[in-house]
Amino acid sequence: MFQEPVYFQIFLFQLDSGASGEPGHSLGLTLGFSHCGNCQTAVVSAQPEGMASNGAYPALGPGVTANPGTSLSVFTALPFTTPAPGPAHGPLLVTAGAPPGGPLVLSNFPSTPLVTEQDGCGPSGAGASNVFVQMRTEVGPVKAAQAQTLVLTQTPLVWQAPGALCGGVVCPPPLLLAAAPVVPVMAAQVVGGTQACEGGWSQGLPLPPPPPPAAQLPPIVSQGNAGPWPQGAHGEGSLASSQAKAPPDDSCNPRSVYENFRLWQHYKPLARRHLPQSPDTEALSCFLIPVLRSLARRKPTMTLEEGLWRAMREWQHTSNFDRMIFYEMAEKFLEFEAEEEMQIQKSQWMKGPQCLPPPATPRLEPRGPPAPEVVKQPVYLPSKAGPKAPTACLPPPRPQRPVTKARRPPPRPHRRAETKARLPPPRPQRPAETKVPEEIPPEVVQEYVDIMEELLGPSLGATGEPEKQREEGEVKQPQEEDWTPPDPGLLSYTDKLCSQKDFVTKVEAVIHPQFLEELLSPDPQMDFLALSQELEQEEGLTLAQLVEKRLLPLKEKQHARAAPSRGTARLDSSSSKFAAGQGAERDVPDPQQGVGMETCPPQTTARDSQGRGRAHTGMARSKDSVVLLGCQDSPGLRAARPTSPPQDHRPTCPGVGTKDALDLPGGSPVRESHGLAQGSSEEEELPSLAFLLGSQHKLLPWWLPQSPVPASGLLSPEKWGPQGTHQSPSAERRGLNLAPSPANKAKKRPLFGSLSPAEKTPHPGPGLRVSGEQSLTWGLGGPSQSQKRKGDPLVSRKEKKQRCSQ
């Protein structure tokens, strides 16, 4: 019936320890085939080693059939015992013939009691073993024309008690067991291909050379579901077909980076379904890899939905610190994905110029490449298992990449990869943009200058003219040009305020009076220190107290100016010696008296009775100027000191010595009293002398009259002005019997330390009298009214006429 016999070589690599058969005996494995009609029958039995060596074949058991359409067949039971301790035996080789027409797979066969012990009870333990079946199809004489190898991985076995019949009450019919699928590899000898996974059980067996790396990858084909174990062992099965589960024999081998990367690409749609629009999608996909793998090993019958639900619950209870490792893993996977796309783009660009023009077009085209071209891509990925990837694994995830990339936000590594692909076109434009701001064009500068001129106005707009003027030394003109008129609205508001009497009064009350005096003087010298101290004292005063303090001195000054000032002149005993010539009484000169003089600068102003100041000059260079040098003090001529110091005093000419004082006509200012005697005809003839300004040059000496001045004729300053001037009418010398008022006495103050009677002084001419309006700060003693009036430019002409008439 068989046209071409098929031979199988079965190698037993591992035998479980635990239960053993009869002592000194080990079991061998026998495989036989028979053909009956359209069915194939195969029997696998275990026999003692002696029987196997003799080549005895077991009889075919009843009901041991195999359907031709079965694609995944496994051993239901493979009972055997471990050989006794002793020298290691080689693998058992059994050759059987099989018809070539049927499929080269094994089907289920009943669990007949193949090995029994003496007590008639088989062991209940289970073990795992690997069986390699090598098939050869021979025509005529036996020769290795076509060689095929099947790798069968046996799951835990079930031994049954003797006497149990298939389908009986004692032993129920066995069910299919979950095992690794059959991986056919054409034209390759893969005997011993699972040595690395199972720990390398070589044991010196005569095995063929190791297979290529592609055969060492775990199977990708999903396994079928199976029922529960009849003896209450652990359940088996798997999750949904889209979930990859590690087979039991590959648990010791860690997943490669490349496989985890592919699983991560498969799990991204699942993670996005549970976390839509979330940045944690990639990290959750990495988290699903170990969690779903553990759930599949613990409970293979668990569905995919249940596994995802458990994984999501575990993810929610995971802390952020524990999630960091998954974020890092997701970042690496994104880099792998971007690098893979870059390599695909490069491979497409190398084919021809049709994909080069736009950078965005090549990114969309490589998503559908043929399968043989993608095999080269794992070489560029930085993973250990990249070259081991089969060609059938890469195409499936490609249709999902555009979907996942379109939904998730582009992470940083991905953006870097995209920018690398887009960098070449814009590079020539960037340097041009950076070079533009290095040099400012003159048009922009001119426009900026025009705008600033419009904003600042025409005064600063013509910047060239003021700069030239400053270079030439003209500084005042730019200052005048820089002045801008104030706001007309502000001016109108100020005028409105000034028109109110109450406002002006309040402002005048607040302004410091000393500041007003300094401001109205021609040469103001403000004492900021004294002013600041006084203002600090006034800070603690209220408004009413401040107004009262400001108005009170003003009222006193007004009353003092209005009251007439009459009285005899008094001089301080500590003042310098003075001598006053009065008419022809002083004609005898005194040769013992020396004459010396120094000039004093004029720095004063005065006011007349109406408050108007008048400056008088021309007295400095007069030949008849009075120069006096006092030598001795006369006890008869002393002036009483004033009872109270003046309110305002400012000396303008320093003293020459302790007892000698030098005064020049015009050398010190003179202020006229507001209340002179109205009955004096001489005073009516004299104009209102405000003050006399002297020259800085030395004046010629002249002799004083010899006649002494009576004690009643001593002069005393009546009033001191704000600029240090005083007034002395000298009424008794003119024949006036007017006594000074008490108010005026209170304001008197001596000019010098002491006074001395005037010695005999020569008189240049008769008819000269001393005016009561003249100052005694420089010891004026002999000149007459005309002599004093000679310093006044208004009476200089009258003086000349009188001299000419004489």
Swiss-Prot record:
Residues 206-216, 355-372 have a biased composition (Pro residues). InterPro entries: NUT, NUT_N. Residues 404-415 have a biased composition (Basic residues). Pfam families: NUT. Residues 201-252, 345-494, 555-685, 703-806 are annotated as: Disordered. Residues 465-479 have a biased composition (Basic and acidic residues). PANTHER family: NUT FAMILY MEMBER 1, NUT FAMILY MEMBER 2A-RELATED. Belongs to the NUT family. This is NUT family member 2D. It comes from Homo sapiens. The gene is NUTM2D.
